[in-house]
Structure formats: structure tokens, C-alpha cells
């Protein structure tokens, strides 16, 4: 993903703000083969039995005992102490406990019966397996330090070192640590300002480092928090917690390096194993074991619509049972093969996230855009690992694409937009309002589908032609015939599909403000369209732009076609309120207009709000009533300075006002 796209409105009241659409790509990197230690003995019910005792490495282990809530043990590295006291307190008491607590509540595992003791890293890349051997033996002994990502693993968490000169000459050195008790996963938390933290978009990253012997489940991992990206500001809380939850999930299982280790519901490997119990094919070039087609398969979309004709479009599908079931359920498409995986973004993003075009704000897509949710699809993925039983009650509702059918799920966004345009219908959840043409802003505010935020259509021109398979328009209003192939949504991972996206207001030398209605700090008293931000506010759309009038002059606020306003539900009726209003206005029916007229700072401000369905905002709504012809404020005279004994000053003031508007 490219960094933030900044633009500027040209209405004078927008000159003090710099609105920009924010995307934060995931910084995941699949750990190298040599950095992941397998075969950690976990000693379930048979403390001296090792899975290698089995003559058939593909047989089901006997320990299919009851599942219990996942227990994650946090171990803070000393690098955390380099953070400021305020940030350190936030990390230790809020950020990590909340992120970890979410997954502990969401997942159940086969519980560890004894303390986790991790393997030591070998000096060389050679090691020995031997029947009855409790631990993997190193060829030339063990390293002094064993790391997990950016963290040093304490000796107290490690097994002793088993080293062999040959299969019969083995000895144990070092001491066995006490291990980590009452835990199923150890998460080592670091705060190193590493090279990967140099990018302004990187907040944190994580990966697994060791897997247990019986079922191959990851049992240890590292999450590194980039110090310069940590913030205690309220506006940043959602994105920080969601990002850390996202990265932890990579360590728990959502990783291209773990797909070949998945198991079915009976505990049997989904991918064929060799006599050592490893997947049969190691892809050395890509750094992971290859999986069988019952996990991920390639599907060809042979008539993929583009603005320049149809092409063949290959996609990668996760086709495990629960994932397929949830994907079909979500879209309402019984012939969908599975859930599409990301095909853009480079190493660490491709195949390790859901496809952005198909699952826009699902938290396990490859870049954060807005309102991230962990849906049933991601929990189904975790169930299909064979390691977890998810609690589907914690799943959040994914509205993107919900029940939009097979055409939405299986065809290009360009075809969806094209067909809707022919039918004269809205292309939801896509859009076609151009944000800017490279020289001037054309942005128009709208409401998100959940009406919890303002949003802009992220359709922009690129400097180069888009890849042929992502040219989603035959033509665009106001764009020359050859220019459509340069236009696409600003989020490349979404196949350049344009959609409404939340944004931030960046004010010079001040904090960022974003477009969410619920945050009171996003508002500004007396601003042009008289908005009210706060926990009781939602987004309302306008039938036409607002105006400001004064001294015979008029300004049309054409960039605004939606705003945030206070609402309440009383006696089965939805009410909406604006800034500087003594009473709230009733919304008796969907699409009813509320007319607002206020004199603020010497200007007559006029605009109308479109009422949504009462049930969109209120849990209890009354029966329909006869709607009055007009609901809103009475007519007001346009203000202007009067000539009196201060007539010279009045004239001068009006002259200044005219100059200000012209500017």
C-alpha cells in the first residue's frame, strides 16, 4: 500500500484543515524456516511419550481431550521499560491485556497439563530424531541465546540441551527451566525501534516461533510494538488495539507458514506428512511448507469483467469446511468455492490475509482502512486449523458484501458498478464520485453504510495506467475517453475498487481529528453545517448542499452532502438536533426532510437533513403518522450590518466580509 493520500478542499472554510484518507498496511513477515522450532514436547497425558514413537506420523494423536479457554501468558521484554511512563502504563494495563483478552475469550484449545518448556536453538542446522527421545537433539550443541522474534527467551522458559555426536552418543547439558505454568501460549512483548518500524505506517508486528509436537499448534510468539507509533490519544485507541489483535492472530495461526500444519476436526493432518511427521514439500524459495489443495486452491475466473473487455483472473481460495460454509453464508452464495485470499501487497500480505475487495473492513485483511471487525469468517478459519474451538458469540458483524449474492462475491467490482449503472441503481458498497482529478478537489462527504462516520469516495487518478485486470471503468463523467484506465480506488489491495472511506482532519500544529461521529473531539463549535459530535451522534445525509448568506452574498458548501448530528429516540420517534438548537427536530418517516435555518457568527446558515428509517437508530418505533408539510426552523432574514451612527464602521465591516468571501 502507498502512504496516506492528502488533498485539500478549496472552499475557504476548509483551508485550515488537511483531510486525508488513512490506510495502514499490515507489516507481517512470515518467519524464516530456521527461526521456527517444531516438535516442542508438551507432555499432555503421557509425559514420556513423544509423537515420533508412532510408526505412522499421520495417525491421530490420542490426546483429543476436552477443550478449555485459551490461556496466553504475557512476558514483557526489558525494552518495554524504554517507553515513557504514560505509554508503558497504557501498554501494560490496557493495550496488551485487551488484545490478549479478546482472543482468550474467543478461543478454546486442548489445554496444557504441564508447564510449557520451549526448545533451545541448535548451533548448526542439523539435528537428530530418535525413537523415545523426549527432545530434538542438536548436532553440535545449543546456542547460548534462544530468541523468539525480537525477544530473548529466558533460560527459565527453556528445556535443557540435548546434543548428539551420532545417534547413539548423546548427552544432556544445561538445566531445564521451570517453564511457564498454566498457559497454552507464551507471547513475548517487545518495544524495539527496529528497521521494520522505520516505515510511518508500521504500528506493530508479530509472528510465531515454536510449535508443539502433538498437533503442531503454535505455542510461543513475539509481538513487537514500534515505540514511535504508540499513542495514548483517544482517536488512536481503536486502530492500535485492532492492530495488536491482528498481529497476535498471525502468531496464533493466521500465517502462510502454518497452513501446511492444519488439522481436520479429528486431529488428522490436512496436508500429507513424511515419515518424520513434517509436510512432504518444503518451498525453500518462499520459505514455507506447501499445503494440499484441500486447504487452499487456485480458482480461475475466466470471464473477469474490465472496462476494456474480459480477462482470465486467477484467485487463491481458502476452501476448508468451516471457511467455505461461512463465506457462502455471508454473501448468500451457495456456489462460492471458499473465501478469497489477498493477491496483492507483496510477501507477508499475499495469502496471509483475506482479499480486501471481498472483505473490506474485516480486520484480517491486509490493510486497515476503517471500522475493523473480527467476523465469523475469521473465527471459522481458526476452527479449521484444528487447534481451536471458537466462540462465535464474540464475532462482530461484517456488513461489507453481506447477502449481496454471487455476483458481488464472484465477479469484479467493475462489473458490479457497470451493471448497477445500467439499472439506474446505487452501486453500494462501491461508489463513483471522483475525489480529485489531480488538480482540484471534487470530494463530497457521504455517510458510511452504518451511519457512524462521514466518508469520502476514494476514487482518484493514478500517474500510471492501472493493471489491465483492475481497470474497473469504461468511462467516467468529466474524464476524457482515454483517461478512465488511470482511475481507481486509492486502496490498491482492494483491486483498485472505489468505496466510501473514513478520513482524518489534520490541523496544522494540532492533533488529528477524524470523521467518526461518536468522538466529541472531532467537532468544532459553530462550523459551517452546524454539526454535533459525541456519543449520541450519527451521520445524516443532505438532499442538496448547505448555503451561507450575508449582505447579499451567498456561499454554497458543495463539498458537504452529509454531516454528524445528535439524535435521540423518544416515545417511538427519532429526533435529530443541530448546533445552537434549543429543541430537537422530529423524524416521522424515512426520507422526510428537516429544514435548519440559524444565524451564527453573522451568517444565515441553511440546510436540510434527510431522515433515515427510525429502526436504523431506535430499538422501538411508533406507527406511521401523517407528516406535516414542513418540519424545521421558521424563515429568517438574511443578516447584514445596518447603517447608523456607526455607519462608516458598518460599511467597512461589510466590505471586509465581501473580501473574505471572495478570498
Curated annotation (Swiss-Prot):
Location of the active site: 247
How many cofactors are bound and how? Answer: Binds 1 zinc ion per subunit.
What processes does the entry annotate via GO biological process terms?
cell adhesion; cell division; proteolysis
Q: Which InterPro entries match?
A: Peptidase_M8
The cofactor named in the record is: Zn(2+)
Q: What does this protein do?
A: Metalloprotease.
Q: From the Swiss-Prot or TrEMBL record, give the protein name.
A: Leishmanolysin-like peptidase
Amino acid at each position: 500500500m502507498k502512504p496516506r493520500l492528502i488533498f485539500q478542499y478549496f472552499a475557504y472554510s476548509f483551508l485550515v484543515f488537511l483531510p486525508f484518507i488513512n490506510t495502514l498496511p499490515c507489516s507481517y513477515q512470515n518467519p524464516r524456516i530456521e527461526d521456527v522450532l517444531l516438535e516442542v514436547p508438551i507432555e499432555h497425558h503421557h509425559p514420556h511419550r513423544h509423537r515420533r514413537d508412532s510408526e505412522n506420523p499421520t495417525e491421530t494423536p490420542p490426546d483429543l481431550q476436552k477443550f478449555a479457554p485459551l490461556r496466553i501468558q504475557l512476558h514483557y521484554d526489558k525494552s518495554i521499560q524504554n517507553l515513557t511512563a504514560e505509554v508503558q502504563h497504557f501498554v501494560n494495563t490496557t493495550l496488551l491485556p485487551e488484545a490478549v483478552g479478546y482472543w482468550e475469550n474467543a478461543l478454546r484449545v486442548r489445554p496444557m497439563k504441564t508447564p510449557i518448556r520451549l526448545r533451545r536453538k541448535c548451533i548448526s542446522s542439523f539435528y537428530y530424531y530418535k525413537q523415545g527421545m523426549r527432545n530434538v537433539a542438536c548436532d553440535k550443541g545449543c546456542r547460548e541465546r534462544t530468541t523468539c522474534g525480537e525477544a530473548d527467551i529466558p533460560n527459565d522458559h527453556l528445556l535443557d540441551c540435548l546434543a548428539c555426536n551420532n545417534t547413539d552418543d548423546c548427552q544432556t547439558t544445561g538445566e531445564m527451566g521451570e517453564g511457564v505454568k498454566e498457559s497454552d501460549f507464551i507471547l513475548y512483548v517487545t518495544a524495539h525501534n527496529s528497521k521494520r518500524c522505520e516505515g510511518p505506517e508500521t504500528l506493530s508486528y508479530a509472528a510465531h516461533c515454536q510449535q508443539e509436537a502433538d498437533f503442531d499448534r503454535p505455542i510461543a510468539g513475539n509481538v513487537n510494538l514500534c515505540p514511535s507509533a504508540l499513542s495514548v490519544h483517544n482517536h488512536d485507541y481503536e486502530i492500535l488495539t485492532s492492530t495488536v489483535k491482528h498481529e497476535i492472530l498471525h502468531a496464533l495461526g493466521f500465517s502462510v507458514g502454518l497452513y501446511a500444519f492444519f488439522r481436520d476436526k479429528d486431529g488428522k493432518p490436512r496436508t500429507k506428512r513424511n515419515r518424520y511427521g513434517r509436510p512432504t514439500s518444503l518451498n525453500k524459495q518462499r520459505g514455507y511448507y506447501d499445503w494440499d489443495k484441500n486447504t487452499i486452491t487456485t480458482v480461475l475466473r475466466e470471464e473477469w469483467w474490465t472496462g476494456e473487455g474480459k480477462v482470465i483472473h486467477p484467485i487463491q481460495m481458502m476452501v476448508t469446511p468451516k471457511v467455505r460454509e461461512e463465506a457462502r453464508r455471508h454473501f448468500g452464495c451457495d456456489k462460492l468455492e471458499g473465501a478469497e485470499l489477498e493477491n496483492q501487497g507483496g510477501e507477508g500480505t499475499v495469502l496471509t490475509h483475506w482479499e480486501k475487495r471481498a472483505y473490506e473492513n474485516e480486520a484480517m485483511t491486509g490493510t486497515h482502512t476503517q471500522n475493523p471487525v473480527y467476523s465469523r469468517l475469521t473465527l471459522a478459519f481458526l476452527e479449521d486449523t484444528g487447534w481451536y474451538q471458537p466462540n462465535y458469540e464474540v464475532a462482530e458483524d461484517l456488513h461489507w458484501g453481506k447477502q449481496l449474492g454471487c455476483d458481488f462475491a464472484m465477479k469484479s467490482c467493475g462489473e458490479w458498478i457497470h451493471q448497477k449503472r445500467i439499472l439506474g441503481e446505487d452501486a453500494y458498497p462501491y461508489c463513483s464520485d471522483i475525489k480529485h482529478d489531480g488538480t482540484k478537489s471534487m470530494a463530497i462527504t457521504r455517510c458510511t453504510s452504518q451511519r457512524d462516520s462521514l466518508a469520502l469516495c476514494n476514487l482518484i487518478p493514478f500517474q500510471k495506467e492501472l493493471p489491465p485486470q483492475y481497470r474497473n471503468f469504461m468511462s467516467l463523467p468529466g474524464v476524457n475517453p482515454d483517461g478512465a484506465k488511470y482511475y481507481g480506488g486509492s486502496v490498491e489491495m482492494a483491486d483498485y475498487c472505489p468505496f466510501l472511506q473514513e478520513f482524518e482532519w489534520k490541523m496544522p500544529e494540532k492533533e488529528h481529528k477524524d470523521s467518526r461521529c461518536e468522538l466529541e473531539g472531532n467537532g468544532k463549535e459553530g462550523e459551517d453545517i452546524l454539526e454535533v459530535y459525541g456519543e449520541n451522534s450519527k451521520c445524516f445525509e443532505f438532499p442538496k448542499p448547505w448555503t451561507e448568506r450575508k449582505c447579499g452574498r451567498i456561499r454554497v458548501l458543495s463539498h458537504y452532502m452529509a454531516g454528524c448530528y445528535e439524535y435521540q429516540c423518544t416515545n417511538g420517534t427519532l429526533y435529530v438536533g443541530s448546533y445552537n438548537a434549543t429543541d430537537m427536530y422530529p423524524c416521522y418517516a424515512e426520507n422526510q426532510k428537516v429544514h435548519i435555518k440559524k444565524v451564527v457568527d453573522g451568517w444565515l446558515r441553511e440546510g436540510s437533513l434527510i431522515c433515515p428509517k427510525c429502526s436504523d437508530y431506535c430499538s422501538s418505533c411508533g406507527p406511521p403518522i401523517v407528516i406535516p408539510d414542513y418540519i424545521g426552523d421558521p424563515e429568517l432574514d438574511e443578516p447584514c450590518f445596518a447603517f447608523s451612527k456607526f455607519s462608516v464602521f458598518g460599511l467597512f465591516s461589510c466590505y471586509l466580509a465581501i473580501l473574505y468571501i471572495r478570498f
